[in-house]
């Protein structure tokens, strides 16, 4: 199995319509043995960081003319929805200095320090070489595939519509009155999509 096959599944539709791409960067649940040996948590606790079964929810997208890119590598191994520079200095020893965003400070950088409820994944920091290996082996292939789909869509259709799928833990919506929404559409406060979409 190639690294790309370990990182993601890419399913193209029989007929691509309108440049729609569904992606699920946090649905990976194929835990490498080396990672399980390094983690201080049991596999069930590690799974709490997944957007569990999101890939199955959108599995029929290709049948409706959309491309589908889903993660196989778990979010707690590497977060495909972060920038490669978002390195937590508490996870990676001798990490290059970066601006500490709220996500990094919360332990949710490109290589997460914690899973849900702040449970630490590791007993101590990993080497810079290990962090670079994960980024090269998992993060870069996923983003090459995603960029390739977007570029192809722009060339064929004049644009691309990326629908990046995530689930939310119950406690993230606890502040909302009941009934809580079944679906939340986000556009990064109007910065990632045209209002027409």
Describe the role of every protein-language-model region.
Residues 1-162, 167-197:
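N-terminal catalytic or cofactor-binding beta/alpha core of small enzyme domains
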């Amino acid at each position: 199995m190639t690294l790309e096959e370990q990182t993601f599944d890419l399913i193209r539709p029989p007929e691509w319509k309108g440049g729609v791409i569904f992606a699920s960067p946090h649905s990976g649940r194929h835990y490498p043995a080396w990672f399980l040996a390094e983690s201080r948590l049991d596999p069930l606790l590690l799974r709490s960081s997944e957007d569990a079964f999101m890939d199955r929810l959108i599995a029929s997208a290709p049948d409706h003319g959309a491309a589908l890119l889903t993660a196989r590598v778990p979010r707690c191994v590497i977060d495909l929805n972060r920038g490669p520079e978002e390195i937590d200095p508490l996870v990676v020893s001798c990490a290059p200095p970066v601006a500490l965003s709220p996500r990094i400070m919360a332990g949710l950088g490109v290589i997460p320090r914690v899973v849900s409820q702040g449970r630490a994944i590791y007993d101590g920091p990993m080497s810079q070489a290990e962090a670079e290996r994960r980024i090269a082996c998992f993060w870069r292939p996923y983003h090459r595939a995603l960029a390739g789909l977007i570029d192809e869509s722009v060339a064929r259709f004049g644009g691309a519509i990326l629908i990046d799928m995530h689930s939310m833990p119950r406690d993230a919506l606890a502040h909302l009155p009941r009934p809580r929404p079944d679906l939340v559409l986000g556009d990064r406060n109007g910065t990632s999509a045209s209002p027409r979409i």
